[in-house]
């Protein structure tokens, strides 16, 4: 990975967008294409569906997608919290089960909090 430059990423992604972006695609279809090509979360490890890019290269992917004015990849807590945690600490079975549906936008995750004594303590109901 260390030999890849932001210029390389830009050139590859721009070429890929030229061949794959279609404004008539549904968001689901587009996100599937992004996931299949490993552009939906390029900082994720390769074995978890990403490209294993560092911050600079992953940031370049976001920049190129924005400049191309295409629909961006899925976002949210699943992508920011769940997928990275599962990629590092999950079993191979958990990685295979949960990460693809997070990266292709099929499933959205949320984070819930319980505040004992404040009315949201579900265990205390």
What spans do the regions from the language model cover?
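A gly/ser-rich beta-alpha-beta helix-loop segment of oxidoreductase catalytic cores
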Residues: 108-125
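Internal, well-ordered alpha-helical segments in soluble enzyme and binding-protein domains
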Residues: 82, 94-98, 125
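Amphipathic, small/basic residue-rich leader segments at the start of a protein or domain
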Residues: 1-76, 94-104, 108, 117
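N-terminal glycine-rich flavin-associated loop
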Residues: 74-93, 119
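Alpha-helix boundary/capping detector
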Residues: 43, 87, 91, 124-125
């Amino acid at each position: 990975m260390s030999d890849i430059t932001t210029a390389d990423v830009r050139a590859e992604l721009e070429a890929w967008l030229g061949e794959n972006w279609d404004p008539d695609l549904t968001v689901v279809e587009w996100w599937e294409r992004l996931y299949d090509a490993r552009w939906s979360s390029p900082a994720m490890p390769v074995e978890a569906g990403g490209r294993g890019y560092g911050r600079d290269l992953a940031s370049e992917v976001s920049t190129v997608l924005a400049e191309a004015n295409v629909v961006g990849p899925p976002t949210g807590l699943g992508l920011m919290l769940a997928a990275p945690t599962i990629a590092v600490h999950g079993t191979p079975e958990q990685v295979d089960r949960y990460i693809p549906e997070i990266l292709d936008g099929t499933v959205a995750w949320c984070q819930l909090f319980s505040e004992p004594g404040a009315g949201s303590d579900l265990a205390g109901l």
